């Protein structure tokens, strides 16, 4: 088993009511105020607000179980137009607005090319497993990542058949119990399945 592990987190949706609330110039809650100031907030903070339980679970889980080699980032977030960024990367209002204008599709060069660039750099790191914490049922992330990473691209087996909220609860419970999930290669996996039993954070 490789001694190192890096997690790739799918992004939060940068549109909708929560994005409108966070990006509003009238918003007075602390995160929104910091977002409008320099240097802004971290990408992890912004996406945790936008996505709620699911991204919060992904971030907490990845931070707990990442085992990166020296000089590598153990937690990397897929973005719509900037490839892979650290969860600690600073972002401001304009960054989030731009994220919301780019479609996540392998047919969209603004999304695909930066992600290909950074994934190829990641492939050069030896003896590392890469775990995708995101949907594998569609090709929006997998089609780009799998072509480059091949058998080294893994995902949590228990993600199959779960929706976003259930995955978030599963990940937070794993962190609370200090129990890492089982992974399997994306290549050749059954990526859709019957709906899994609902999981609570406390359960």
Model-predicted regions and their roles:
Residues 1-203:
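Peripheral peptide segments
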């Amino acid at each position: 088993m490789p001694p190192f592990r890096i997690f790739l987190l799918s992004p939060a949706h940068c549109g909708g009511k929560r994005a409108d609330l966070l990006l509003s110039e009238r918003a007075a809650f602390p995160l929104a105020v910091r977002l409008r100031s320099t240097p802004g907030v971290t990408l992890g903070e912004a996406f945790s607000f936008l996505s709620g339980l699911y991204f919060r679970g992904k971030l907490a889980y990845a931070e707990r179980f990442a085992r990166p080699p020296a000089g590598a980032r153990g937690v990397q977030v897929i973005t719509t137009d900037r490839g892979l960024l650290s969860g600690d990367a600073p972002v401001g209002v304009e960054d989030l607005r731009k994220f919301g204008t780019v479609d996540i599709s392998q047919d969209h060069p603004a999304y695909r090319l930066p992600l290909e660039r950074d994934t190829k750099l990641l492939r050069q790191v030896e003896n590392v497993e890469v775990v995708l914490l995101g949907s594998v049922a569609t090709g929006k992330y997998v089609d780009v990542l799998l072509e480059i990473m091949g058998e080294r691209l893994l995902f949590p087996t228990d993600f199959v058949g779960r929706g976003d909220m259930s995955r978030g609860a599963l990940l937070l419970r794993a962190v609370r119990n200090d129990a890492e999930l089982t992974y399997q290669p994306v290549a050749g996996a059954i990526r859709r399945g019957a709906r899994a039993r609902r999981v609570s954070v406390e359960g």
